[in-house]
Design a protein with these regions (language model features):
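Glycine-rich phosphate-binding active-site loops on the catalytic face of alpha/beta enzymes
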Residues: 81-103, 159-162, 190-197, 204-224
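Short, acidic/polar
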Residues: 30-41, 75-81, 135-146, 198
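Conserved anion-binding
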Residues: 12-25, 81, 88-163
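Glycine-rich, proline-tolerant flexible connector loops at the mouths of alpha/beta enzymes
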Residues: 48-59, 95, 157-167
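Conserved beta-strand positions in the central sheet of alpha/beta enzyme cores
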Residues: 50-53, 69, 92-93, 117, ...
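Catalytic cores of alpha/beta
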Residues: 56, 63-90, 172-208
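Charged helix-capping and loop-helix junction motifs
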Residues: 56-58, 133-142, 167-175
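Conserved, mostly hydrophobic/aromatic
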Residues: 10, 41, 49, 83, ...
Length: 232
């Protein structure tokens, strides 16, 4: 399998949680130290970690070799630099791409497309921003197209309706989006439930996928992922 598998780590009060469709009232909390969880990811051979907590990010960056991509509330260059200083290798920018596209374009020029990821979160085919509370008329392709010539290299595209629902990803949609932008890595997020989902995405030509709830609930195990590492 060639697709890169990126575990997700969302935290509330220092504990790993998974939300259903981003709803904090429908969250499941998983015990254990997040650092121990990250160390298990690393031991399994995973290379990247997707997370949204700066304090825990610093601990994990200092104690593992995982490449951390951080997303959540990056609205200024100062905030972006804080994320990098905390140890993140990549930063995910969503709302700022819609509200201040010139700002993201400038960051892409300064930091490079290998460090800046566009966050494209979709509800009913339209981009949602501000923690998914505000919908826009933009589609994913339109938003990606705005930054294709600005050095954009990676997009995390989250299907909000499927996030945390274990219902399977919208594979055909992602495959079409990847085909439209062959020079941009489209990272799938939302709905992953089984190894079969990962296999289908891999066969469809997707390059990376974020796995959250299925991993924490044991539907996909670290042993499974260890056998699915790229080119193994």
């Amino acid at each position: 399998m060639n697709i890169e598998i990126i575990p997700a780590m969302d935290l509330i009060d220092g504990a790993c949680v998974r939300l259903a469709q981003g709803d904090y009232d429908r969250r499941t909390t998983y015990g254990g130290d997040p650092l121990d969880t990250a160390l298990r990811f690393e031991a399994a051979g995973l290379l990247r970690l997707h997370m949204v907590d700066l304090e825990v990010l610093e601990r994990i960056a200092a104690r593992t070799r995982l490449e951390i991509q951080y997303g959540g509330g990056i609205k200024s260059r100062t905030a972006l630099c804080d994320v990098f200083s905390a140890g993140a290798r990549r930063a995910v920018c969503g709302s700022v791409a819609v509200r201040e596209p010139d700002c993201l374009a400038a960051w892409l020029a300064e930091f490079g497309g290998e460090r800046l990821i566009l966050g494209a979160d979709l509800r009913d085919g339209r981009i949602a921003i501000a923690g998914w509370s505000e919908e826009t008329p933009l589609g994913a392709a339109e938003l990606i197209g705005r930054f294709r010539k600005q050095g954009l290299q990676q997009v995390i595209c989250t299907d909000i309706a499927r996030d945390g629902m274990l219902c399977g990803p919208a594979t055909s949609f992602y495959a079409a989006l990847q085909a439209e932008f062959p020079n941009v890595e489209i990272t799938v997020s939302g709905g992953i439930a089984t190894l079969g989902d990962l296999t289908a995405l891999d066969r469809a030509g997707l390059r990376s996928v974020i796995v959250g709830k299925a991993l924490y609930e044991g539907r996909i195990t670290l042993e499974d992922l260890g056998r699915c590492l790229p080119n193994e």
